[in-house]
Amino acid sequence: MIYPKTYDVIVVGGGHAGTEAALAAARMGAQTLLLTHNIETLGQMSCNPSIGGIGKGHLVRELDALGGAMALATDKSGIQFRRLNASKGAAVRATRAQADRILYKATIREMLENQENLDLFQQAVEDVTLDGERISGVVTAMGVEFKARAVVLTAGTFLSGKIHIGLENYEGGRAGDPAAKSLGGRLRELNLPQGRLKTGTPPRIDGRTIDFSQLTEQPGDTPVPVMSVRGSADMHPRQVSCWITHTNTQTHDIIRSGFDRSPMFTGKIEGVGPRYCPSIEDKINRFADKDSHQIFLEPEGLTTHEYYPNGISTSLPFDIQIALVRSMKGLENAHILRPGYAIEYDYFDPRNLKASLETKTIQGLFFAGQINGTTGYEEAAAQGLLAGANAVQYVREQDPLLLRREQAYLGVLVDDLITKGVNEPYRMFTSRAEYRLQLREDNADMRLTEDGYKIGLVGEAQWRMFNEKREAIEREIQRLKTTWYTPQKLAEDEQIRVFGQKLSREANLHDLLRRPNLDYAALMTLEGAMPSERLSAEVVEQVEIQVKYQGYIDRQNEEIDSRRDIETLKLPDGIDYGKVKGLSAEVQQKLNQHKPETVGQASRISGVTPAAVALLMVHLKRGFKDAK
């Protein structure tokens, strides 16, 4: 049957990408349908019970700046918060939280059920329908056809998923859930370029069988950090500690003894796993000289005894899993609640996507999350929001939301995917960004909220809070510039106390704050230095960073401006680069293969030289007359 209601946007999949995509589309006013094989698993944390971290936390803040759900849901479910790299430069400081997975899932479910313009339906999708080269809808397992002008696919690890434990394997999307075999087969029929990747998860441990007296405690930070600009510490549930243990030489010997039954070493697994989140057997094999690896025991929630041992993801046989866990300090009597496993799944080459995350071959079909070759909740959620928003822009025939590399980590993520593709699961790091001083956690709202508000992603309450913060920052910076001190105005002992030396000349607070040995709090102890209005910690942080890093930021802005022309310069559709005179055969081949949308994208394709970019600029001015 054909369902009687036609939707603007259909989202397939209810993980982190799918929920953000559906919420984004519905916030923008589009009639949206979220289809999931099981409503009870909406927003489920399939692997580790944590959100954020270096690079990943930056993405969460960007999601939040665009009205997304992940940061706020983390504030409502986070049971431990830490600020990573707190003593380092502002660019690499990041927030990480342990989340109660039951609370997190319940919070996302509540957001979905209370979102206007959003319908939910429980049924696996087995087919997509086309009208020529345009998407027209989807068909579920029981034959219901839902019509829509745009579809966002966020299938995660479910497409032709296969789970491995030792030499045993079976079809599945994750433990306890079926694979999307029919949908995976249908997408292959559409000749979308695809491949296989692998990820894994560790065994879960019953906390009642852990000897915590043998472990090192790792408490959260005080004061407790907050993830969302709409959140507060008052939202946080009870806070708890994580715990640290280590592998040892006995552990490593046990792991090696299982190599002959490992699906990874016996060739049972074909997909490539994540380089930066390797299995414990991969670590022992690659770093054979290391006698020990640190393992974090992370609580799964406040109402369960389950612990997640971060660092021992494995697909080794279950008897080896038991032995390796019990070989570690504090875990001698540990009971495993769930075995670790690896999962192989289909992904689709993201070089077949536009910067909007729409496929180049099927109009109105958008991909987000692990289907694009990424790994991680945060990477998936960020893509989901962008794909959901751009699906609405597509339906409305309006320009897509495109984020530049110097504007957002989400811009870096998408640009890396669509220009370079992936040969292993892609994870975000701050080192992937050329302009990371611009892309700090603390200024995500300053970079993105205005763009989000313009297209309806950001609500009025968040927009009002943003403007109040922005204006407070501007007022305080201006006040610092107009508050002057002379050597005669301050007592000599006060000058030495605050500045470490006597003032040699008149200076304002703005110039004094730029000194490397001075911070805002110390300056405010000067007589007459305190502002008349009470400033939030977030405003003070922004003021201090903007003032102290102004010279570096200005230099980066000059570099960005010098590249902006080539970054945004559009390349026409339908160019046969084989006919573009002067380009080498390698460059012609790679440009035809990747089909970049802009000169900036072309410049980042491996093998495309600066000389080739200059030649493209010349041909662009002439209109590529010979190449159409």
Swiss-Prot record:
Keywords: Cytoplasm, FAD, Flavoprotein, NAD, tRNA processing. Its main location: cytoplasm. InterPro entries: FAD/NAD-bd_sf, GIDA_C_N, MnmG, MnmG-rel, MnmG-rel_CS, MnmG_C, MnmG_C_subdom, MnmG_C_subdom_sf. It is found in: Cytoplasm. Gene3D superfamilies: FAD/NAD(P)-binding domain, GidA associated domain, C-terminal subdomain, tRNA uridine 5-carboxymethylaminomethyl modification enzyme MnmG/GidA. One of its GO terms (cellular component) is cytosol. GO terms for molecular function: flavin adenine dinucleotide binding. NAD(+) binds at residues 273-287. Coiled coil: none annotated. Its cofactor is FAD. FAD binds at G13, G14, G15, H16, A17, G18. GO terms for biological process: tRNA methylation; tRNA wobble uridine modification. Pfam families: GIDA (PF01134), GIDA_C_1st (PF21680), SAM_GIDA_C (PF13932). NAD-binding protein involved in the addition of a carboxymethylaminomethyl (cmnm) group at the wobble position (U34) of certain tRNAs, forming tRNA-cmnm(5)s(2)U34. Belongs to the MnmG family. NCBIfam families: mnmG_gidA (TIGR00136). Homodimer. Heterotetramer of two MnmE and two MnmG subunits. This is tRNA uridine 5-carboxymethylaminomethyl modification enzyme MnmG. It comes from Neisseria meningitidis serogroup C / serotype 2a (strain ATCC 700532 / DSM 15464 / FAM18). The gene is mnmG.
